[in-house]
C-alpha cells in the first residue's frame, strides 16, 4: 500500500515567526510515524510511505524578498542569488525534519524538487528515483521549492502541487492531509465522509460565500483525491495520535473515498 502524507498548516512551524520550529509537534509526529511503521511491520503488512511538507516559516519569508508585483502579476527578481537562497532555506527546513525522523530510526531521505523538476505547460517531475527508494523501503521526504519555469523563468511549487502529481504517477492508495483544522468544515463542524453521493453538494458549499476555507485549498485537496480515485483523510495533525491513526486509516476527521 502506498500512502502519501502531507504535513501542512501550522503543524511544523509558525509562518509569522521566521525560521521557527514547533519542536514538540515535530517530535510527536516523528514518534507517531515510527509507531505506525512498526505496527505494519509487526502485522506483516506492507506500507510504502512518502512525506510531503511545505515551506513553513523557512521558505515563505525568503521567497517574499525576491517577489514583486508587475502589471498585476507576481514576478521574481534578482534570482541569480534568490534561487540559491530560497533553495537553501527549504533545504535547511527539510534537514531539520529529516534529522528528527532519523532520530526515531525512520529511514527518511531528502528529495529536493529544484534539482529535477521543471514547470512548463505542465509539471515535469522525474519520479524514477522515488520509485527506487520505495522499493528499498526508504521514506522519501519531499518539500515545496523554487523550480525552473521554462516560460516564466521561475516558479514556486507547493506541497499541494506535489501531492496530486505523485498520487497520479505512483498510483497512491491513500492520501493524508494533516492540517490545523479538524477536517472539511461545514458550519464550523467537520463532515464525517465525502464520496460520490455528496461530493457536488460539498464542493458547492465550499464555493459559496458562507464558506471559510481556512486551509486556503480544501476544495483542491478534495478534488485531487476524487480525480485520483483513491481514499484519503483531512484531519487535524496538531492533535496527539492523529498522525498514527491516519496512517492506519482510522483517524477522526473527514474521510474522502473515491476508491474503486
UniProtKB/Swiss-Prot annotation:
Outcome recorded upon mutating residue 86 to G: Confers low activity with farnesyl phosphate
Effect of residue 156 to G: Confers low activity with farnesyl phosphate
GO molecular function, one term: isopentenyl phosphate kinase activity
Gene Ontology annotations for the cellular component aspect, listed alphabetically: cytosol
Chemical reaction(s) catalysed: isopentenyl phosphate + ATP = isopentenyl diphosphate + ADP
Thermal characteristics: Retains 38% activity when incubated at 100 degrees Celsius for 10 minutes.
pH effects: Optimum pH is 7-9.
Signal sequence annotation: none
Resulting phenotype, residue 83 to A: Confers activity with farnesyl phosphate. Confers low activity with farnesyl phosphate
Entry's EC annotation: 2.7.4.26
Residues flagged as site, Transition state stabilizer: 15
Biological process (GO), any one: terpenoid biosynthetic process
Keywords in alphabetical order: ATP-binding, Isoprene biosynthesis, Kinase, Nucleotide-binding, Transferase
Entry annotated with the keyword ATP-binding: yes
Binding site for ATP: 6-10, 56, 180, 217, 221
Family: Belongs to the isopentenyl phosphate kinase family.
Function recorded in the entry: Catalyzes the formation of isopentenyl diphosphate (IPP), the building block of all isoprenoids. Has no activity with farnesyl phosphate.
NCBIfam families registered for this protein in UniProt: IPPK_Arch
Quaternary structure note: Homodimer.
Record-given protein name: Isopentenyl phosphate kinase
UniProt organism field: Methanocaldococcus jannaschii (strain ATCC 43067 / DSM 2661 / JAL-1 / JCM 10045 / NBRC 100440) (Methanococcus jannaschii)
Lineage of producing organism: Archaea, Methanobacteriati, Methanobacteriota, Methanomada group, Methanococci
